[in-house]
Every structure is written in C-alpha cells, then in structure tokens.
Amino acid sequence: MIGARAAGEMVNQLTALLARRISGEAASEPATYLGIAGVQRWRELRAADAHGQTELGKKLQQIAEEGAEFGIHLLVWSDTLAALERAFKRGILNAFDLRVALRLSESDSNNLLGTPLAARMDDNRALFRHEDWESGRIEKFKPYAIPDAEVLEALLSRLRKG
C-alpha cells in the first residue's frame, strides 16, 4: 500500500516492470500488487490534459488494463465512484473483475455492481461482486477496520512467498 506522496515513483516503476514483462524479460518474476488507498487524494491525477487524463493517470490506466495478464494487479479504494472515474478514463471498471461496495446511491450501485442492492444495505455491510459476472453472484459481508501495520506486513509476506 502506498500513499499519494509515493504514487508517482511507484507507478513509474510498475509501468517499467509491465513493459519488461510484456517483452518477456521479466516474465518469471512473482506477482506484484499495488494497493491504492484513497485514489481521490492523488493530486497528480486531477490536473488532466486535453484528453481528460494526466500522465500518471495514463500509466495507471495501462497497468489496470494490461497488468493482470502479466502479474501486476491493482487494489484501489475510492470514497466515491465519481472519484474513481475521475482518476481513470471512462470504462475503467471493465478492468476490475473483483469489486467491493459499501452503501452507494442506486445509480452508483448499478454502475459498479450491476445491481441496486448496495443502495438498500444497512450500515456495517458490504457487497462483493465476483469476476464471474454471468453467474450474478454477489456476497454480502460485514467489513471491519483496516488491519494494523503488523497484520498487513504478515499478509504481504505471505503474498510474496506465493
């Protein structure tokens, strides 16, 4: 997990890694995960060019669209669907197969999950949409607090080991 201050350098490193993996140079390296906590706070994504995207946004877009095939995965948390759509181009949701939502407006729920269920949820509940969209499978669960740094480090260590 990285914060907004380290975003630019990390995204540059991952874009370079993606290019190496696409060319076959780094194909055997282990999977890489980039956790973006609060994409709405990434100022570098706000000042868009004439096409509606910053240079950092273009690189993140490429990682989101092509990275999973080459073992580079994004975990993105955003406070609103609109903030996520500002950070990336329209259609970015197609790059995210697994989605989690707390209570949302009916429109955002339909756009994110393909169902209005998240608009009718109680507090302290969340929905998880699986990558198998055809099945329509959605799981309801109780989210809890973000784990402390020690727990996150243990999880990251396990992920690195494979």
Q: Can you say where each PLM-predicted feature lies in the sequence?
A:
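Conserved P-loop NTPase
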Residues: 105, 109-162
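P-loop NTPase catalytic phosphate-binding loop
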Residues: 1-112, 119-121, 150, 160-161
